[in-house]
Regions:
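All-alpha RGS (Regulator of G-protein Signaling) helical domain and cognate RGS-like helical scaffolds
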Residues: 1-112
Length: 112
């Protein structure tokens, strides 16, 4: 969910197509976070980790576009790695969404 919040901050600081693209990316991350919360039965509970506040990366908050891109690329790379690590633990038949999410995050990181 940190990635969703980070992209929302970036969307708020951009105009036009940049704002739309960042908002779309935020929505993707928020939807995945919701799906995970529901799949693990923590949605709406006191155990839902999305209830926490996040320390956003300094580069994202600096207003420097290059620093924000570096921080967002790092977040996306860490997500790609986390999704890939979960593939090995996933039950057969449930790996495809993890692979899709990992590849998507890796592409997003590379595009930054």
């Amino acid at each position: 969910d940190l990635a969703g919040q980070a992209w929302e901050v970036l969307a708020a600081r951009r105009d036009g197509d940049g704002r739309t693209a960042a908002a779309d990316r935020a929505a993707t991350h928020r939807a995945r976070a919701q799906a995970w919360a529901e799949a693990t039965d923590v949605a709406g509970s006191g155990l839902d980790p999305r209830r926490a506040s996040y320390a956003l990366p300094a580069g994202l908050l600096s207003g420097d576009a290059a620093a924000a891109a570096v921080d967002l690329a790092d977040l996306e790379t860490r997500l790609a790695d986390a999704y890939a690590a979960l593939v090995a633990r996933a039950v057969a038949g449930t790996r495809a969404p993890l692979l899709v999410a990992s590849a998507d995050a890796a592409r997003a990181a590379a595009a930054l």
